[in-house]
A protein has these predicted regions:
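Conserved SAM/AdoMet-binding glycine-rich loop
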Residues: 57-159
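Active-site mouth loops of central-metabolism enzymes
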Residues: 43-46, 101-108, 173-180
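Conserved functional loop/turn residues at catalytic and ligand-binding sites
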Residues: 29, 34, 122, 161, ...
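Conserved C-terminal portion of the radical SAM core fold
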Residues: 125, 148-207
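Short microdomains enriched in Cys/His and/or Lys/Arg
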Residues: 45-62
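Canonical Radical SAM [4Fe-4S] cluster-binding loop centered on the CxxxCxxC motif
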Residues: 4-48
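Short, acidic/polar
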Residues: 49-50, 109-117, 180-187
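Conserved, mostly hydrophobic/aromatic
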Residues: 25, 33, 49, 68, ...
Length: 207
């Protein structure tokens, strides 16, 4: 298996088979995150991807769910995502769904019809690090989008039938702003249909 850089998956994907689709992050500007500061975004070459699929087929031929690693594999183009999804299904005929991390920014360049095609190919389970639904907090964290963007892009996922999950981060709004952040985030998330919302806490480390 080819794994480079930081490789991790959310706890709820513990039973999914993992494969590297990308490494690094396309953005690397979130103020609270240093996971990928020194790691440029890279797509795994198809040759590597297929070699890993062949290895998975040998040891876990009945795999039903595959988690693509990397900070945001959904940043890949529609064509690349679709090619890889169908390649997975060529190797793993019992695979039902493929999941991965995504940013709101990654959904913007995809039309609803493209999202439907990706869903038909088996992509169904986007972990989206929204962190907040409060505009002031999103700006402070330098997320690169606002609450309206979250609603607009996730409604596209709803229309396409793609399941998605939110991450909410406590402590991100700064001292004295937690209540405002929580209320505004709850109002925003209630307009959408995340399958679930996981909660993380901001932890500060010295540089």
């Amino acid at each position: 298996m080819h794994f480079t850089g930081r490789t991790w998956r959310p706890p709820y994907e513990a039973h999914s088979v993992i494969i590297q689709a990308t490494s690094g992050c396309t953005y690397r500007k979130c103020r609270f995150c240093n996971l990928y500061n020194h790691e440029c975004f890279r797509m795994s070459p198809m040759e590597e991807f297929e070699e890993d699929l062949a290895e998975i087929k040998t040891y876990q031929p009945n795999a039903r769910r595959i988690f693509w690693t990397g900070a945001n594999p959904f940043a890949m183009s529609y064509e690349n995502l679709r090619l890889r999804a169908w390649t997975v299904r060529d190797y793993l005929i019992k695979c039902q769904t493929m999941a991965m991390f995504s940013s709101i920014r990654d959904i913007k360049n995809k039309e609803v019809w493209q999202l439907r095609k990706l869903r038909a190919a088996g992509i169904n389970g986007l972990s989206i690090g929204t962190e907040s639904g409060d505009d002031q907090t999103l700006l402070l964290a330098n997320k690169g989008y606002n609450s309206d963007d979250i609603v607009e892009q996730c409604r596209k996922l709803d229309e396409a039938g793609i399941e998605y999950y939110f991450v909410y981060m406590t402590g991100l709004a700064g001292k004295g702003n937690g209540y405002r952040n929580a209320v505004n985030s709850a109002r925003l998330f209630s307009q959408l249909n995340p399958y679930f919302i996981s909660v993380d806490s901001l932890t500060l480390f010295p540089d």
